[in-house]
């Protein structure tokens, strides 16, 4: 049974995975729930605030369902990032995003980052780093490995493993949560998206943490608990 992203109950909004989720792209483009000139005007305002914003291709989530044997299927339509960003200043575009996140670990510690003050979502809040949007035509696991290098300056030790899919109701985004073992902790300054990076115990993530990060705490504890013995080998 498909789950409406706005109506699924709390138990349905987290799906544990034993294999990567399937992303099925529909043939119909995303149609916003409001007039396009409102979106364009709001996007122009956001770009004036933060010139680093980019209106790149993203997926809108139409629905999510379990498909048995520890998997999930995510039905999506193509659109661009502005449909997501404008919601943060009150434009009801109807967009439901698809993100990719990681619990990146080394030697029993997790990588967290304090988001920049000009980030579109969760500014000045801590989150598990890295994170980003699932880009069309890029595998979600490959994408989060790329984000680790671009945002944190660290290479992955092995391929990202998808552990769960969950819904962040604050920003209306479905997130694929991955495990990433790192080659080493970050030793370079983070890019503009983070004010700073730290390695912490999964049970002691700094405050204020984002609502999304709070949802990921149990995922992180499972990942780190299962991986401590392997990080230093």
Language-model-derived ranges and their functions:
Residues 198-201:
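Short acidic-hydrophobic, aromatic-tinged amphipathic segments that line or gate anion-handling sites
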Residues 151:
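Short alpha-helical functional segments enriched in proximate histidine and acidic residues
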Residues 195:
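Lipid deacylating catalytic domains
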Residues 1-125, 132-146, 154-186, 205, ...:
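N-terminal leader/linker segments that precede catalytic domains of diphosphate-processing enzymes
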